[in-house]
Amino acid sequence: ADPPIHIASL
């Protein structure tokens, strides 16, 4: 399970 990182953070 990946941490809830926002797509904009990528």
Swiss-Prot record:
It catalyses: (R)-amygdalin + H2O = (R)-prunasin + D-glucose. Signal peptide: none annotated. GO terms for molecular function: amygdalin beta-glucosidase activity. It is an enzyme of class 3 (hydrolase). The keyword Ribosomal protein does not apply. Glycosylated. It comes from the Eukaryota. Keywords: Glycoprotein, Glycosidase, Hydrolase. Disulfide bonds: none annotated. Its EC number is 3.2.1.117. Monomer. This is Amygdalin beta-glucosidase 2. It comes from Prunus serotina (Black cherry).
